[in-house]
């Protein structure tokens, strides 16, 4: 984390998200403060808590993407949840503590991936030995000389153990050398693969306890294996992953996952405006109950998970909402106070759409060009055509519902629909997208307000 200053974090975010400078600065400062906190005296460190962020802005302007890219940048555990999925304690539905359990699971996957990468060489060496075992076994079972089939039953010409061991060692040495030289990649072998246990209850509402029980039973019960016939090339990554899993110190992984979730975890609470209350009708009371349930998690509490107790005191919470029908002040005062940093995100303009289409590392135009390029159809967009697409997106957003940058996906699909359908049967060709090409396919629909509501 210490590698990135706030300015560098903003520059990294600029590679993926256009505009929204205030939001980027806010999350960059919050992230840097985490690093600063680690440098403090331990007695003071526990007193410094993250300053949670409330993002206010319409859909499709980059709220979620900023948080997701931020987490990816520093390899922090990240989970996105929707406030509307939760119900008040005592009702059927997901309880708010499940967001912390989800974060720990995300942290566990992150730590496991890192540990497996570090163990990859050792795991691959063990996997190669298993492949050699399979190859030697296959050679032995087919018989070297194809002699009398009754020899196996009566042992008439069985070799002495010393000779058998020497021959096996010689065989293994030859096969190992051929394997490392890549001569046996297409050879078929029989390997025993551990069957993955089906997670019956994961993600189901109200089933967290049963998921924990299933996990405990899975550790006690013997693991099932299934024999599969694969080529050496196909078997190697499967066996390597299996061996890496065995080499993991699960206690160490669990401890690190919990530590990272507590100290670096980011929870993105979307649609928080939907649980804001105005009146005191029954629905309003229920939504207020959800807010009061979320409050202790954000304030700092301990949640019991199957990996041990997890403290939420130093997790960073980023809440977001459009706040069309409600205001931030409609949230209960205690919850408002837990999100001291408020950032308003701007609606996207025509110029923003042009930048979104062209500037990010994996810009939308680059994606479509690559997709069609896979069929040897090479597409180029003129600058005027890009401007035309951006203009139509801004126009439709203004005249109908404003869905931000997601409007570009709809329009791009309409523009390239015919080409995408025909590309597989076309010879290698170059296609230039002009403003007229764009207007021929979406112009009439964009201009007709009734049609654009249903189609774009």
Swiss-Prot record:
- Subcellular locations according to the entry: Cytoplasm
* Source organism superkingdom: Bacteria
Molecular function terms in GO for this entry?
Answer: ATP binding; ATP hydrolysis activity; peptidase activity; proteasome-activating activity
SUPFAM superfamilies associated with the record: P-loop containing nucleoside triphosphate hydrolases
The UniProt entry, under Pfam families, shows: AAA, AAA_2
Q: Which amino acids does the record list as binding ATP? A: 18, 60-65, 270, 334, 406
Which keywords appear in this protein's UniProt record, sorted alphabetically? ATP-binding, Chaperone, Cytoplasm, Nucleotide-binding, Stress response
Among InterPro entries, the record links this protein to: AAA+_ATPase (IPR003593), ATP-dep_Clp_protease_ClpX (IPR050052), ATPase_AAA_core (IPR003959), Clp_ATPase_C (IPR019489), HslU (IPR004491), P-loop_NTPase (IPR027417)
Q: List the disulfide bonds.
A: none
The entry assigns this protein to a family as follows: Belongs to the ClpX chaperone family. HslU subfamily.
Its annotated function is as follows: ATPase subunit of a proteasome-like degradation complex; this subunit has chaperone activity. The binding of ATP and its subsequent hydrolysis by HslU are essential for unfolding of protein substrates subsequently hydrolyzed by HslV. HslU recognizes the N-terminal part of its protein substrates and unfolds these before they are guided to HslV for hydrolysis.
Q: Subunit structure of this entry? A: A double ring-shaped homohexamer of HslV is capped on each side by a ring-shaped HslU homohexamer. The assembly of the HslU/HslV complex is dependent on binding of ATP.
Protein's recorded name: ATP-dependent protease ATPase subunit HslU
Species in which this protein is naturally found: Exiguobacterium sibiricum (strain DSM 17290 / CCUG 55495 / CIP 109462 / JCM 13490 / 255-15)
